[in-house]
């Protein structure tokens, strides 16, 4: 299950980093992951979390709505600036609505359940949760893989990509659709587990190069190994209550992110 979910996460992150040409790009930049989390939180708020498949369905629907709103706001120009600004706005809006739902939770138990779920974990998940999201995620993965060559061309710059026949507006729409399906599936199953997509590609790039298409499979395997090890650590750690996987990944990811920023600053100096 770790392998399956991590593959979803890594593919969408690599697509995002390739499209934005920013090695620090993260799913939160699009706002779709925040929308998926909002959908899952709403299912808990309305007491539907116990209904079979309700939580993943809410997350997938919210991710799809977020993707539609993102495409509407970004327009048809394919502009990276508009796309990024629309994603930041969408992420802020979904985050604010999630905080509002937590604030309006009918009982302290509902509020605690929402916060616990948002921390991300695999301990209480099953293959039933994965299977409901799997068909849509397969479509999302296929959309991303079909555009792998366009992402490689885009790494040479906008003008070079256009001269090679890349339709920027179409590429944007296809990637938003693929990323929305992968984000919705991963958040629906595991909650919010951050920094995996940020750390793993940087570990793999020195070994396989910088082409997005060459990074996809090695990053997925390396990411799965990282998540499995982190999940084992949080399960056996000698603490009073189990540390959530999302918390552990954030503890590992924040120093890694800082090291990347310092490295980039030295290179630019």
Language model features with spans:
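Alpha-helical transmembrane segments in inner-membrane proteins
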Residues: 1-269
